Amino acid sequence: MLRSSAITQGIQRSPNRAMLRAVGFNDNDFNKPIIGIANGYSTITPCNVGLNNLALHAEASTKVSGAMPQMFGTITVSDGISMGTEGMKYSLVSREVIADSIETACNAQSMDGVLAIGGCDKNMPGAMIAMARMNIPAIFVYGGTIKPGKLDGCDLTVVSAFEAVGQLTSGKITEDKLIAVEKNCIPGAGSCGGMFTANTMSAAIETLGLSLPYSSTMAAEDKEKIESAERSAKVLVDAIEKNIRPLDLLTKKSFENAIAVVMAVGGSTNAVLHLLAIARSSGVDLCIDDFERIRQKVPVICDLKPSGKYVTVDLHKAGGIPQVMKLLLDAGLLHGDCLTIEGITIDESLKNIPSEPPANQNVISPITKPIYKKGHLAILKGNLATEGCVAKISGIRTPVLKGPAKVFESEEDCLDAILKEQIQEGDVIVIRNEGPVGGPGMREMLAPTSAIVGQGLGDKVALITDGRFSGGTYGLVVGHIAPEASVGGNIALVKEGDMITVDAHKKLIQLEVDEKELSKRRTLWEKPEVKYKTGILGKYARLVSSSSKGAVTDQP
């Protein structure tokens, strides 16, 4: 029996049917599945500006496939626009709002399935969390990646603009060049074009089996993206008939597959946070140490920005995520028996994919000739992060750094010091009170890290924080330090000039202060005053878990 029969069947549901008739239902529609189309369309950001067209095509395809679509909106936040401002505190919060809104609409209206369409970073994990909670047949349609901008024969992304700020302040470029980068780095619709957070999470969702093959790397403005949205609707209607549900796909093995692909493509640190959160909603026992275990086995085989050369549309041309998955599968690094939304296994889905990457490209390397022999997202532990933290270590020349702490209580204070050239080679920059509770909202530190890179210090300093990093960040950066400063983590006890060791080889992050001194400082530490007592940020700060647990708000 369809779940929607609760609102469509029986004499007592005559008023319900009357409402449905007013939005287009006819007599013969009340026995059809009702599919919610969660539309993240927004003119706030280029990531989402093209979504309505995809939603309309998915809606039409749903009808043709024998189901009844009901479209509703959900929010988005533009990380790129809010970056470096107080507004960025709402970014991670929006993941929870998106999840809550999709769950609310679908469950309130007794929908039989949901097709979610998203573009910007938090759209993907937000939709996945909702799908896992509801466990009704579901599929995700990614809005697509942006094509690269061009200037002087070079590919540009939004990160180019952030780095240009640092280049300008250090005298490496003129203001005219900065404006030229600004005008050319984002040429149209789509999510930020490197293997940043949005493209990382879309790749993870494709690997998990909840979006169609190749769909995670398509360009937003290409015709195949429309065709993919239409086909997604048909596949979802079929999944309802077969009763294929998200929790049939979201297993420990499938999450291990997703982590492996994130490592192979050189994906964002945010994947750690989001996959932990999705797993929690799925009832899957995934922990931060699983990322380190898989990192040790899976090499980086894709040369993608931010630390590499190419952008996501180049990956698509080279074979996309299916090609990456095939290489991992043949190497024994992927579980082939995991189910996909199409009702077939990973093995079956990849059976016709070549066992070697195309010879006429340099985006995907053979598994035997990786770009890096191990994954790039290392989990470090030590007295500065007893619950762990995440370091992005690909493309860095300084995997070990011991230096004096430069301590900042906010992102703004740190950026000001960087732009005033107060950061020296060998420094360990500490930005604290930016965690899930302390921010609140765990802002991304793209502005400081890009300014550092722009000044030529990207491989000469380390930056550690209880906040997050954008998927566009590279260099020796360590985020998600847990416990965070605002709940009394040892990062709160760091003083200016303390020596800190960051050792990616030993997976160590250590404050070189003895326990006796730390205990003394701990007794003197005072919990910071709550920054937001009301509104969504106040509510979030009261509810949110540690970043080591995914920074979720629906913990029992």
From Swiss-Prot:
It catalyses: (2R)-2,3-dihydroxy-3-methylbutanoate = 3-methyl-2-oxobutanoate + H2O; (2R,3R)-2,3-dihydroxy-3-methylpentanoate = (S)-3-methyl-2-oxopentanoate + H2O. GO terms for biological process: isoleucine biosynthetic process; L-valine biosynthetic process. SUPFAM superfamilies: IlvD/EDD N-terminal domain-like (SSF143975), LeuD/IlvD-like (SSF52016). Binds 1 [2Fe-2S] cluster per subunit. This cluster acts as a Lewis acid cofactor. It is an enzyme of class 4 (lyase). NCBIfam families: ilvD (TIGR00110), PRK00911.1 (NF002068). Functions in the biosynthesis of branched-chain amino acids. Catalyzes the dehydration of (2R,3R)-2,3-dihydroxy-3-methylpentanoate (2,3-dihydroxy-3-methylvalerate) into 2-oxo-3-methylpentanoate (2-oxo-3-methylvalerate) and of (2R)-2,3-dihydroxy-3-methylbutanoate (2,3-dihydroxyisovalerate) into 2-oxo-3-methylbutanoate (2-oxoisovalerate), the penultimate precursor to L-isoleucine and L-valine, respectively. This is Dihydroxy-acid dehydratase. It comes from Prochlorococcus marinus (strain MIT 9211).
